[in-house]
Swiss-Prot record:
Subcellular location per the Swiss-Prot or TrEMBL entry: Periplasm
Superkingdom of source: Bacteria
Database matches in Pfam families: Oxidored_molyb
Subunit structure and binding partners: Heterodimer of a catalytic subunit (MsrP) and a heme-binding subunit (MsrQ).
The organism of origin for this protein: Azospira oryzae (strain ATCC BAA-33 / DSM 13638 / PS)
Knockout consequences: No effect when grown in presence of chlorite, growth of a double sigF-yedY2 mutant is completely inhibited by 20 mM chlorite.
Residues reported in the UniProt entry to bind Mo-molybdopterin: N74, Y77, E78, C133, T168, N216, R221, S232, A233, K234
Protein name according to UniProt: Protein-methionine-sulfoxide reductase catalytic subunit MsrP
HAMAP family the record matches: MsrP
Gene that produces this protein: msrP
GO cellular-component term (any): periplasmic space
Post-translational modification: Predicted to be exported by the Tat system. The position of the signal peptide cleavage has not been experimentally proven.
Length: 312
């Protein structure tokens, strides 16, 4: 799918059908006036630089998707169902300071982190990752963040923790989409504990060397590059370590369409989108989709012996 949608493209072709049907109510909500809000992190000016970043050997050397596309074309249904809605509605609405993330559950050291605490948790790195949307388009994004494993090490999961659940902000005053029953808010995602501890799994606080824009999930979001983009929860406010597999938002919305693992797999199509190929934003010729989004060498061992058609 190209960054510019054809004028005759129906909403139901790019969003799940229940969301397309509820769109009118959401757009009505977006007409409400926005409260002024800051975008930057503490001690960092709005859209400010994140300073010197440590390069990462885990980065891709592929051509980057332009910043304008990364920040202007994305899914963030809390602000609207069109790709351009987050850029239109999130800046100036989403208050990202003060911000806290509560970490709780099956851990020895439960804690509520301020965004300043999180910024000091580990050296920030630039991670250039491929991002693959289940809708059949992709980008290459230079994220800034630190491994989720660093936070996990701080809170010390106990022997009962098997999964990690991520809960995002759901504030109808800031996020007009939350007023509409398009999804079961707040947005919830989850990972197996070993997936969360994998070196590739990132908590991102920026992109392109700058503070994370509101429309991209500020001030802190998850990035799991071998999974479809919807697994990477935005604007996280709570992280829970749990015994049972979390039931994610998209699993509730379409259990036959969205599985818990949601690993990029060209051999398993979504009911409405082929996963065999993808359109890299900014390119005109489709390219073949790689298993695990090209990260098979690093992560395939996590799923050894699993039927990836069944556990999609």
């Amino acid at each position: 799918m190209l960054i510019r949608r054809p004028p005759d493209l129906l909403p139901s072709e790019i969003t799940p059908e229940p969301l397309a049907r509820g769109r009118r109510a959401l757009l009505k909500g977006l007409g409400a006036g926005a409260a002024l809000a800051g975008l930057g992190l503490p001690q960092i000016s709005q859209a400010g630089s994140l300073g010197t970043l440590r390069p990462s050997p885990l980065s891709s050397d592929e051509k980057l998707t332009p910043l304008k596309s990364v920040t202007g074309y994305n899914n963030f249904y809390e602000f609207g169902t069109d790709k351009e809605d987050p850029a239109r509605h999130a800046p100036g609405r989403l208050k990202t300071r003060p911000w806290t993330v509560t970490v709780e559950g099956e851990i020895k050291r439960p804690r509520t982190f301020s965004i300043d605490d999180l910024l000091k948790l580990a050296p920030l790195e630039e991670r250039i990752y491929r991002m693959r949307c289940v809708e059949g388009w992709s980008m290459v994004i230079p994220w800034v963040g630190f491994p989720l494993a660093e936070l996990i090490r701080q809170v010390e999961p106990n022997g009962q923790a098997r999964f990690v659940e991520f809960v995002t902000l759901a504030d109808p005053q800031q996020m007009p989409g939350v007023r509409s029953p398009l999804l079961d808010w707040p947005y919830v995602e989850g990972l197996r504990l070993d997936e969360a501890q994998h070196p590739l799994t990132l908590l991102a606080v920026g992109l392109y060397g700058e503070v994370l824009p509101a429309q991209n999930g500020a001030p802190i979001r998850l990035v799991v590059p071998w999974k479809y983009g919807f697994k990477s929860a935005k604007s996280i406010v709570r992280i829970r370590f749990v015994r049972e597999q979390p039931r994610s938002t998209w699993m509730k919305a379409g259990p036959s369409e969205y599985g818990f693992y949601s690993n990029v797999n060209p051999a398993v199509d979504h009911p409405r989108w082929s996963q065999a190929t993808e359109r890299r934003i900014g390119e005109f010729i489709k390219r073949k989709t790689l298993p695990f989004n090209g990260y098979a060498d690093q992560v395939a061992g996590l799923y050894s012996g699993m039927d990836l058609r069944r556990f999609f």
